[in-house]
Amino acid sequence: MGCDVSRPQRITVLGATGSIGLSTLDVIARHPDRYQAFALTGYSRIDELLALCVRHRPAFAVVPSTEAAVRLRAGLAAAGCTTEVLEGEAGLCQVASAAEVDAVMAAIVGAAGLRPTLAAVEAGKKVLLANKEALVMSGALFMEAVRQKGAVLLPIDSEHNAIFQCMPGDYARGLSAVGVRRILLTASGGPFRETPVEALLDVTPEQACAHPNWSMGRKISVDSASMMNKGLELIEACWLFDAVPSKVEVVVHPQSVIHSLVDYVDGSVLAQLGNPDMRTPIANALAWPERIDSGVAPLDLFAIARLDFQAPDEQRFPCLRLARQAAEAGNSAPAVLNAANEVAVEAFLERRIRFPEIAGMIEQVLDQEPVVPLPSLDAVFAADQRARELSREWLRRHGR
């Protein structure tokens, strides 16, 4: 896929009002000669989306409902902004696959991001993948579509982007063929890394969302606190880099300075370091194979002074064990894991369940739901739906 270098690249930002979307727009705004926002999408923060449209003047904006569209159109008209408003999943897929688009930032959180992200892949776009659930739910189908349609897939998660930067350019030949022994996926350990296990019963959503190093949305903050985020990233790494789960090792690194490492058979270990700011991987993927200024401050090694590492505690973080088991089982297991986790995290944020019950609920759903092949997108969503129903049934059974 080529683009006219005499004009700025047109970027669709799926999930523009979220943390990744806002960081993407920050990087884009630093390089108006290179990039322009073509389409911005939002879900519940319509006023924020309106402000972004007025500032960035995209051709399109997408919202989930007619009610939201009416509200956004009124605001745009009052501001003299000509952005056209589209609705629903059809609108998302339209702006993800439009002929004018050069790159798509896929940053819608959760299963809702799968169809529009896949639409971008099937249109052969350069896809900046921040929605890890797309690969967790439908890894085999997704990667096959990438190959068949000639899409360019660039990881945005700081860990996967770090691995990408530490890999040789021809890693698609196979990890053993390029001398990679294992992938070392770093994890901060989140806010509860040293909390006594018995005290986890009483932690609040506010405590779970107070990450020591990163600024993130509420859902991913809870996933980070439970280490389910790292489990989902393990599954994602297996698909992105064609690795078996045993080749991906999780390392707790509290400072979040080393974003991941690649261990080679000759004894070399390559690591990518940087301040914990998502604008670095976003800028890396936007400009790849070139480099651009991201607005992130240079890393001050003297201020850091030390880097610590430890093995993850699976008694404290059972979600990591469940995710590895799902990765090893393959087929529908990761999709079921993801769906059960989405329901459990929502229930925790609504104070309907306690923090340790997130893992307990997911484990019961995984035990109840048989592992089956997922030959189509319909099969993926059917597995997702069954897992959500089992999760809601668990909540009802436990009086939640």
UniProtKB/Swiss-Prot annotation:
GO BP annotation list: isopentenyl diphosphate biosynthetic process, methylerythritol 4-phosphate pathway involved in terpenoid biosynthetic process
EC number: 1.1.1.267
EC category: oxidoreductase
InterPro entries in the record: DXP_reductoisomerase (IPR003821), DXP_reductoisomerase_C (IPR013644), DXP_reductoisomerase_N (IPR013512), DXPR_C (IPR026877), DXPR_C_sf (IPR036169), NAD(P)-bd_dom_sf (IPR036291)
Name of the protein in its database record: 1-deoxy-D-xylulose 5-phosphate reductoisomerase
Gene for this chain: dxr
Protein residues bound to Mn(2+): D157, E159, E233
Species whose genome carries this gene: Pseudomonas putida (strain ATCC 700007 / DSM 6899 / JCM 31910 / BCRC 17059 / LMG 24140 / F1)
Pfam families reported in the protein's UniProt record: DXP_redisom_C, DXP_reductoisom, DXPR_C
Co-factor(s): Mg(2+); Mn(2+)
GO MF annotation list: 1-deoxy-D-xylulose-5-phosphate reductoisomerase activity; manganese ion binding; NADPH binding
Lineage: Bacteria, Pseudomonadati, Pseudomonadota, Gammaproteobacteria, Pseudomonadales
